[in-house]
Every structure is written in C-alpha cells, then in structure tokens.
C-alpha cells in the first residue's frame, strides 16, 4: 500500500488520526519543510486552518512541501481534517489542494476523527491503492 504524508500542528490532532490508521506514514516537519522530500506516490492528510473568509486554509509548511515539483509530482490524493463549526470552510484545505494539484479529494474528517472515520479511511486506502496499481 502507498504512503501517507501528513502535517500536524502542536495540537497533534492530525498526528493522532494518522497514528490510529496504522499505515506507513511520513510527517512534514513543522520547520524546514523545504528539505523534506518524498520520492514515491502518497496521499496527503492535512488539517484546515482559515479565517472566516477561507484565507490561509492550507498550512504554510504544506504549501512549501507542495511547491517542490518532485513532491507535488507524487501526490495521488488528499484527505482533510477540519472543524465543522467553521461551516463552509470545514475541510477547505482539501478542496484547495485537490484543485491545485488535480488529485481527488478522498475524505474529510472532524478534529481527530471518529472510529468510523478511521475504518473508512483504512478501507478506502486499500481500495484506492489497489486501483492505483492497475
């Protein structure tokens, strides 16, 4: 199965979700993302940060990571975390990355996700990577 690449802030919400998946994963560092390189296909798991207008939805570290052409060339899909209290901007980072990188927006979960979210993503990743190998 492919790799999960993720970013998590000090809250560790995204990290906790990814850890519960039990899948192979690599974390984008909070500092120095410019030197972080991935050389294989991956699905990106990203939290959403934004103001009320949706600005700043994608964390700066993730933007720097994806600005590297090699990293961007290996992304195959995106999963976003968010907070439904923010209404229309819930999971907005996934929409932005999906559109800019032209990859599918595979799933959205709230905060650290539920057990159902974890099961859905695990099962979805198995199906996704099986199709990617065809």
From Swiss-Prot:
One of its GO terms (molecular function) is FMN binding. GO terms for biological process: protein modification process. Pfam families: Flavodoxin_NdrI. It comes from the Bacteria. InterPro entries: Flavoprotein-like_sf, RNR_Ib_NrdI_bac, RNR_NrdI. Belongs to the NrdI family. Probably involved in ribonucleotide reductase function. HAMAP family: NrdI (MF_00128). This is Protein NrdI. The lineage of its organism: Bacteria, Pseudomonadati, Pseudomonadota, Alphaproteobacteria, Hyphomicrobiales.
């Amino acid at each position: 199965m492919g790799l999960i690449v993720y970013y998590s802030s000090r809250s560790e919400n995204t990290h906790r979700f990814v850890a519960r998946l039990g899948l192979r994963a690599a974390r984008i560092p909070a500092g120095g993302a410019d030197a972080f390189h991935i050389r294989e296909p991956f699905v990106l798991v990203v939290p959403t940060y934004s103001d009320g207008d949706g600005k700043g939805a994608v964390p700066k570290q993730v933007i720097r990571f994806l600005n590297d052409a090699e990293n961007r060339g290996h992304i195959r899909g995106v999963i976003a975390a968010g907070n439904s209290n923010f209404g229309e901007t819930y999971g907005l980072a996934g929409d932005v990355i999906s559109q800019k990188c032209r990859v599918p927006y595979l799933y959205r979960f709230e905060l650290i996700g539920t057990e159902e979210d974890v099961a859905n993503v695990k099962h979805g990743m198995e199906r996704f990577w099986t199709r990617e190998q065809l």
